[in-house]
């Protein structure tokens, strides 16, 4: 048939037409009477475990013929997880991989992962990562919708081709490429709501003062607050000197939204095929902001990322394929002026009595009473904000030449890649 699926064939009555295509169920039609037009619709076939193809260091092989420890990851399963970072979806979904997320800050909520344990061979325990045959330092910013296959090589027999670099395991990722046929456009959008998992609960000012007095008395020390002071704290008549501030409720939202959108298209003919995609990811932060400040003065943490990819396959000759690829991402991370970690440090170091948010005359205290710690509201909203821009561009060229005339199954593969990275850090006061 042609690329539109139209075909013409001469056939006699009561003969059977058989339609088959790799990856689809075979369809058989018995021709009866004066039938001139036969339209069929083929359904995708679930691959039998025995016939399953796995990507290895030497190319694609049937799972039945592999003796090494290789895990073929179900990428469709990973796509179901509403996360802006691909590495977070690996936890619990890839056998043998240990993952650890060290931060929940937007843009830094990545997971470090190990294939052969944390204490492994060599100075570094990180696995080697190859995307379309090119080594990459990480996969934090990879668009999950661009992934065609994901394999994990674990033991020596599977990773031997990579030498000492593969001693801690190898991650092989193949991105999507175009298929011959009509243009196919796919669009997808997701939204999710993220909440804090565990946040310590702090007592109010009166309970804090009472418990502090009890603690000092048990250590044979004088009480910190006298009865008349406790009465003022309980009544709330002097908020300047005896405040009662719920800092957690003041600084933190109950949750924040995340968004993910992707559009891709692929198609082509027998000579050239293409795949192109665009993606957008956004994670909003959980800090409240000072509404009295100008609208563009956003001290809340947030993260935005734009991904793009273009893969072009050209059949130069029946035995020679040229593959051209360009991909990259532009991301922007916003954070309070002193940094996220500083805000949390001040929040957990302050109690309800340490300082009012504002004095009754409108002034904002920079530091708490009897402490060198900064007012959490000041550190989160009054110290400016930071913008960090990162731009990554990755280009690659691959040529594959079949050498069956020398040895059947022999293929020569040559690769060339050029990457550029740049970043820009801006502090707004």
PLM-predicted stretches and their roles:
Residues 1-308, 322:
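Short, small/polar-rich motifs associated with maturation and membrane association
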Residues 221-224, 237, 357-361, 378:
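Extracytoplasmic gating/loop element in the C-terminal half of outer-membrane beta-barrel translocons
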Residues 214-216, 338, 418-428:
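Eukaryote-specific, cytoplasm-facing alpha-helical/coiled-coil scaffolding segments in long proteins
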Residues 196-198, 242-279, 283-287, 299-374, ...:
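Flexible loop and strand-edge segments within Gram-negative outer membrane beta-barrel domains
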Residues 188-192, 279-281, 327-329, 400, ...:
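Outer-membrane beta-barrel pore domains and translocons
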């Amino acid at each position: 048939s042609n690329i539109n699926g139209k075909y013409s064939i001469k056939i006699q009555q009561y003969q059977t037409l058989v339609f088959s295509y790799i990856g689809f169920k075979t369809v058989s039609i018995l021709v009866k009477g004066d039938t001139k037009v036969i339209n069929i619709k083929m359904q995708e076939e679930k691959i039998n475990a025995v016939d399953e193809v796995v990507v290895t260091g030497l190319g694609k092989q049937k799972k039945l013929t592999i003796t090494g420890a290789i895990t073929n990851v179900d990428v469709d399963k990973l796509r179901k997880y509403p996360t802006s970072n691909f590495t977070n979806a690996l936890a619990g979904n890839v056998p043998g991989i240990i993952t650890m997320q060290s931060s929940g800050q937007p843009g830094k909520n990545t997971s470090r992962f190990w294939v052969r344990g944390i204490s492994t061979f060599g100075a570094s325990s990180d696995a080697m990562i190859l995307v379309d045959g090119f080594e990459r330092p990480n996969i934090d910013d990879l668009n999950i919708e661009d992934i065609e296959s994901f394999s994990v090589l674990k033991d020596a027999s599977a990773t031997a081709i990579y030498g000492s670099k593969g001693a801690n395991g190898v991650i092989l990722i193949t991105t999507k490429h175009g298929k011959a046929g009509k243009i196919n456009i796919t669009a997808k959008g997701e939204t999710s709501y993220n909440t804090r998992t565990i946040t310590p609960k702090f007592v109010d000012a009166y309970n804090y003062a009472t418990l502090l007095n009890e603690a000092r008395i048990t250590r044979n020390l004088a009480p910190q607050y006298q009865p008349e002071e406790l009465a003022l704290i309980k009544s709330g008549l002097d908020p300047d000197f005896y405040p009662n501030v719920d800092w957690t409720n003041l600084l933190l939202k109950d949750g924040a939204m995340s968004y993910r959108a992707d559009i891709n298209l692929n198609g082509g003919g027998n000579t050239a095929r293409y795949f192109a995609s665009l993606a957008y990811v956004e994670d909003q932060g959980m800090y409240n902001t000072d509404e009295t400040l100008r609208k563009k003065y956003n001290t809340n943490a947030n993260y935005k990322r734009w991904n793009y990819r273009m893969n072009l396959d050209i059949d130069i000759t029946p035995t020679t394929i040229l593959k051209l690829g360009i991909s990259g991402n532009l991301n922007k991370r916003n954070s309070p002026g002193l940094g996220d970690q500083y805000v949390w440090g001040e929040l957990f170091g302050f109690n309800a009595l340490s300082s009012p948010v504002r004095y009754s005359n409108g002034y904002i205290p920079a530091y708490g009473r009897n402490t060198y710690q900064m007012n959490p509201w000041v550190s989160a909203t009054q110290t400016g904000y930071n913008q960090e821009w990162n731009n990554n561009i990755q280009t690659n060229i691959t040529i594959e030449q079949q050498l069956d005339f020398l040895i059947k199954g022999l293929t020569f593969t040559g690769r060339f890649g050029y990457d550029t990275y740049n970043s820009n850090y801006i502090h707004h006061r």
